[in-house]
């Protein structure tokens, strides 16, 4: 059985020859947006694999003798043979891309060609060799077989006809309807031209690789169809019958494989675009193994081609075209492969199924081979294609990105491939609304403060906040409301009242969130004073005087007047009052009884307040004294003397008598000052002594106390000093306490002495004389290493020394410390004002309040205060550079209003001098400027033109050399300019020449003396006059040029002049 490709080519050749021999094939009526419902058992339909325009599809049907209808549907061409008219009745559908074009043919066909064509058509499958199987047609046209209702059939509207005209471009003439030579299919209006039936199938070659000029018509564009189509000749492969043997040989098969690597063999049915042929000439040739027939356009009236069934050779006439007896190559049929439309899925959906669709369907008892390949995929995709040799490919666990798949379908004589893209998009993000945050949520101000800040920059969102909007909910009307659409709300000129503000933030997705902030502005209230006369007092005679204190009275502004007076019930009592209009009232000469005193205070607003205090004077009540001889003593022999101290004894009225006496002991002692509070005992020996103290008051009441003195004889061990070892202190912490309490002694340590080492820094203060106590307290230490020696001494005079070391390390935040000098006394800067100032600085520097750390506040002068602080960034915490913070703060302060901060800023600078001075000097910590080393100086350009930073970049030696060089160059250049000017002036001074007109001159002399370039002297009156010059610089006597001298000097000139101009003449000054 012959291959289908060869049979189809033979069929196309026959119908081409038949079409050339018979009358013209004409285009009939065209229906747009219409389909047919044929009986697939009796109606033959063939699908053309390539995509053609409508006009080319019609031409292909005209070239096939048994084709009655060209059906162009969705970009594909179908050739239909209609044995029954009702099978090809157009039915209108919706707006689809479908066009039905009927072809008109003569009723009578040549018998010999018809018999041969029927023989070829009836060979093979029952539905015709050129028709596809009904199953393939149903797969390709899924709507066939449906029962279309009558309501779907309607007349065509004007827009359908306009579309039809745009696609087909019909001419203006119309073929008369009802001709006997055509069937009764409707004629297309204006279808005047006919179609040439001299085209068959030819292997298609890609446009970029075609070289054969006879096959160049395959590349012609079909975008502009014309009613008349050009003629061309084609090469058609003829089929071989079973009797002719094998068509393809092994060497031809190898050639086909080599050619298929450059261009895939395709079997296509191409329509002809030719004018109505006048004749068709066909040369008779001998067809051997695989002949190729060349059909040349010619006259169909004189030549009828013979079917290529004869194998007998024949001689060719001069008019016949030679046919190359080459063997027809084996052709590979191109398959139309589609993997479906490009897919787009969105996570979490990560599975997809791909299926390959192939047209035409595989022949009976054969199948196609499928191969799926992944051409491109995201970098993070690690999967592999499994079961990639099936028609359906299942994919799972796809990640985000673009996947490009290629499916290759092949069989023994067919090949095709298709591509499909799978795009996996990330899961849709769920937008979270923003969170509006205001800081602080509640503020309270008291006049005269009338400005406030509310910060909304701490609001957060999962993407981005694009807008802030502030609005006042309630409160007094604000005349000046600024920055309502910025993160920070600045309010000024506030009136007393309660304010509420709403902040609304909007993110990039349009979600909003709101929160409120409250602000309370209080009036400057003048509260009345509060009088405080102090607590009640009780005194006992004979004490009859006391002082009352009213300085605890208070007022929010100032108390201007104090008034003391006797209270109710005490008006007639005797008392001496002093300082009745001062805070302190001195009372004296009081008698037994109760006194009531009233204090009235008046403030600056004349508001008053009163308070009452009671003084009770009790009668005299004597109590016995209390004798205190002191703690018991323990002494070490030998003892020169011992002191007995009874000064701690007490009495309510006073002790008037002291007496010491020796009660018992191992030996007699000598006592001095036995009638005084402090007595001295000598002559003590080893043992225990008891002494008694007796005291008496004025009323004779007495009291006694006993003191024990133990005298021991022991060996004394020296004490052990413990100063505390080594300590490390990190600035700004500059205070420390050295503890020597761990020093020990067998008896008792009686003295401690801390001595600073001579090599230690002198800076640093000792608090409260603690260098003589057990603990040494130090403050105001500076960077360096301090050494202190602790000397301890016991009661026997033995001593010991130990050393303590304090290493003060520099502040790690030194490079970030900024000094802010404010015009305010250090005593007036309260804690509340400091917190407000920190919030204002945070707004200026665009940081949080907690990011600003105040390290030190100290007085700069009586009217100024220095605040030392640093700024740390958000986690991870890092201290910002002081130079950047100072520069940023200075820039922001210059842009804001003068009263933005609570106090006027006098200076902003770094706390330490951080300049490196280019390695040729050091930085002055007071002036914050570089002090250059010897032979170095500042870079004046950088200092005064660029960034203004102090430095020591210039060497004085090089600057001096450069300055000297510049002076020399400047002087040389000046001297050169002076010389050039003098030379130019010298060249300009020339001899002035006077000219006199000479009239008697010939034409040659005039030409010789004529000025160059036609320049005329301003003293001449004629163009051709001759001038005689006189010099003013030679002498005072004029030099006269005469014609006689010229003639004597040059005889030739004289001769020639006399011949041309006549006799010579003399010209001198008298002739002028």
Curated annotation (Swiss-Prot):
InterPro entries linked to this entry: FN3_dom, Ig-like_fold, KIAA0319-like, KIAA0319-like_C, MANSC_dom, MANSC_N, PKD/Chitinase_dom, PKD_dom
Organism of this sequence: Homo sapiens (Human)
GO process annotations (BP): central nervous system neuron development; multicellular organismal response to stress; negative regulation of axon extension; negative regulation of axon extension involved in regeneration; negative regulation of dendrite development; neuron migration; positive regulation of SMAD protein signal transduction; sensory perception of sound
Pfam families: K319L-like_PKD, KIAA0319, KIAA0319_N
Key words, A-Z: Cell membrane, Developmental protein, Endosome, Glycoprotein, Membrane, Neurogenesis, Repeat, Signal, Transmembrane, Transmembrane helix
Signal peptide as annotated in the record: 1-20
UniProt-recorded name of the protein: Dyslexia-associated protein KIAA0319
Cytoplasmic topology ranges: 977-1072
Domain annotation MANSC: ranges: 21-99
């Amino acid at each position: 059985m012959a291959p289908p490709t060869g049979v189809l080519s033979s069929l196309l050749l026959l119908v081409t020859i038949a079409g050339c021999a018979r009358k013209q094939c004409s285009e009939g009526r065209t229906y747009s947006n219409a389909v047919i419902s044929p009986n697939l058992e009796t109606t033959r339909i063939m699908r053309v694999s390539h995509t053609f325009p409508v006009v080319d599809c019609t031409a292909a049907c005209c070239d096939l003798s048994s084709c009655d209808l060209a059906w162009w549907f969705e970009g594909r061409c179908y050739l239909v043979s209609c044995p029954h008219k009702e099978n090809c009745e157009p039915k209108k559908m919706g707006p689809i891309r479908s066009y039905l074009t009927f072809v008109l043919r003569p009723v009578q066909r040549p018998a010999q060609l018809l018999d041969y064509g029927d023989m070829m058509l009836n060979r093979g499958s029952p539905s015709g060799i050129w028709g596809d199987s009904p199953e393939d047609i149903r797969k390709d046209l899924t709507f066939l077989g449906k029962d279309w209702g009558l309501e779907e059939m309607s007349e065509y509207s004007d827009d359908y006809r306009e579309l039809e005209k745009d696609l087909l471009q019909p001419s203006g003439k119309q073929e008369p309807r009802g001709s006997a030579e055509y069937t009764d299919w409707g004629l297309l209006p204006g279808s005047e031209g006919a179609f040439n039936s001299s085209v068959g199938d030819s292997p298609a070659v890609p446009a970029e690789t075609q070289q054969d000029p006879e096959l160049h018509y395959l590349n012609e564009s079909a975008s502009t169809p014309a009613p008349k189509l050009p003629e061309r000749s084609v090469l058609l492969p003829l089929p071989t019958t079973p009797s002719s043997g094998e068509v393809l040989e092994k060497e031809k098969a190898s050639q086909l494989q080599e050619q298929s690597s450059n261009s895939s063999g395709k079997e296509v049915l191409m329509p002809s675009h030719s004018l109505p042929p006048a004749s068709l000439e066909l040369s008779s040739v001998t067809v051997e193994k695989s002949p190729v027939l060349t059909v040349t356009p010619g006259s169909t009236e004189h030549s009828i081609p013979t079917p290529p069934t004869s194998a007998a050779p024949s001689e060719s006439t001069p008019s016949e075209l030679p046919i190359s007896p080459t063997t027809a190559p084996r052709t590979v049929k191109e398959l139309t492969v589609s993997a479906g439309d490009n897919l787009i899925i969105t996570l979490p959906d990560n599975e997809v199924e791909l299926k390959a669709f192939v047209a035409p369907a595989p022949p009976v008892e054969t199948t196609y081979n499928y191969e799926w390949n992944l051409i491109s995929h995201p970098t993070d995709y690690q999967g592999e294609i499994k079961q990639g040799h099936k028609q359906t490919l299942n994919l799972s666990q796809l990640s985000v990105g673009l996947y490009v798949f290629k499916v290759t379908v092949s069989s023994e004589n067919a090949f095709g491939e298709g591509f499909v893209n799978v795009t996996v998009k990330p899961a849709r993000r769920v937008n979270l609304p923003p969170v509006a945050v205001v800081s602080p949520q509640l503020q309270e101000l008291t006049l005269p403060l009338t400005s406030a800040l509310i910060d909304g920059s701490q609001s957060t969102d999962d993407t981005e906040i694009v807008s802030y909007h502030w609005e006042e909910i309630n409160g007094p009307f604000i005349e000046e409301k600024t920055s309502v659409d910025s993160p920070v709300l600045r309010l000024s000129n506030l009136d007393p009242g309660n304010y509420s503000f709403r902040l609304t933030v909007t993110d990039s997705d349009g979600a909003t969130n709101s929160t409120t902030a409250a602000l309370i502005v209080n009036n400057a209230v003048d509260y009345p004073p509060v009088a405080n006369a102090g607590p009640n007092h009780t005194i006992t005679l004979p004490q009859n005087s006391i002082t009352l204190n009213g300085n605890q009275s208070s007022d929010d502004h100032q108390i201007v007047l104090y008034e003391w007076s006797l209270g109710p019930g005490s008006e007639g009592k005797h008392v001496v009052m002093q300082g009745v209009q001062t805070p302190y009232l001195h009372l004296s000469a009081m008698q037994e009884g109760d006194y009531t005193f009233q204090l009235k205070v008046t403030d600056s607003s004349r508001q008053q307040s009163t308070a009452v205090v009671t003084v009770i004077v009790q009668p005299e009540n004597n109590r016995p004294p209390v004798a205190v001889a002191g703690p018991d003593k323990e002494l070490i022999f030998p003892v020169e003397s011992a002191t007995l101290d009874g000064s701690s004894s007490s009495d309510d009225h006073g002790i008037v008598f002291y007496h010491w006496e020796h009660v018992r002991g191992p030996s007699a002692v000598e006592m001095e000052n036995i009638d005084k509070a402090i007595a001295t005992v000598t002559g003590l020996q080893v043992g225990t002594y008891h002494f008694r103290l007796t005291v008496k008051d004025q009323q004779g009441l007495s009291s006694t106390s006993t003191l024990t003195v133990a005298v021991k004889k022991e060996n004394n061990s020296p004490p052990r000093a413990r100063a505390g070892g080594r300590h490390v202190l990190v600035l700004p912490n500059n205070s420390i306490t050295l503890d020597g309490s761990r020093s020990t002694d067998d008896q008792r340590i009686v003295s401690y002495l801390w001595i600073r080492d001579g090599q230690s820094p002198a800076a640093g203060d000792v608090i409260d004389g603690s260098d003589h106590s057990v603990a040494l307290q130090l403050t105001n230490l500076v960077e360096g290493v301090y050494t202190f020696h602790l000397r301890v001494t016991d009661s026997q005079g033995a001593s010991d020394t130990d050393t303590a070391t304090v290493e003060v390390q520099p502040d790690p935040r030194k490079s970030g410390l900024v000094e802010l000098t404010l015009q305010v006394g250090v005593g007036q800067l309260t804690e509340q004002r400091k917190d407000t100032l920190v919030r204002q600085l945070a707004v200026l520097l665009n940081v949080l309040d907690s990011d600003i750390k105040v390290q030190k506040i100290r007085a700069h002068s009586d009217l100024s205060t220095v605040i030392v602080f640093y700024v740390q960034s958000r986690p991870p915490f890092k201290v910002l550079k002081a130079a950047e913070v100072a520069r940023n703060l200075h820039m922001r302060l210059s842009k804001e209003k003068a009263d933005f901060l609570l106090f006027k800023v006098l200076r902003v600078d770094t706390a330490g001098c951080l300049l490196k001075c280019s390695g040729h000097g050091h930085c002055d910590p007071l002036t914050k400027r570089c002090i250059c080393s010897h032979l170095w100086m500042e870079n004046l350009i950088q200092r005064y033109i660029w960034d203004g930073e102090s430095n020591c970049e210039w060497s004085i030696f090089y600057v001096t050399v450069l300055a000297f060089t510049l002076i020399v160059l400047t002087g040389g250049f000046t001297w050169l300019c002076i010389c050039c000017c003098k030379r130019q002036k010298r060249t300009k001074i020339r001899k002035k020449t006077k000219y006199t007109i000479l009239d008697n001159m010939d034409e040659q002399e005039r030409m010789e003396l004529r000025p160059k370039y036609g320049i005329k002297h301003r003293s001449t009156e004629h163009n051709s006059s001759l001038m005689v010059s006189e010099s003013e610089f030679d002498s005072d006597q004029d030099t006269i040029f005469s014609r006689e001298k010229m003639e004597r000097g040059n005889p030739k000139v004289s001769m020639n002049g006399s011949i041309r101009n006549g006799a010579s003449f003399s010209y001198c000054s008298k002739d002028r």
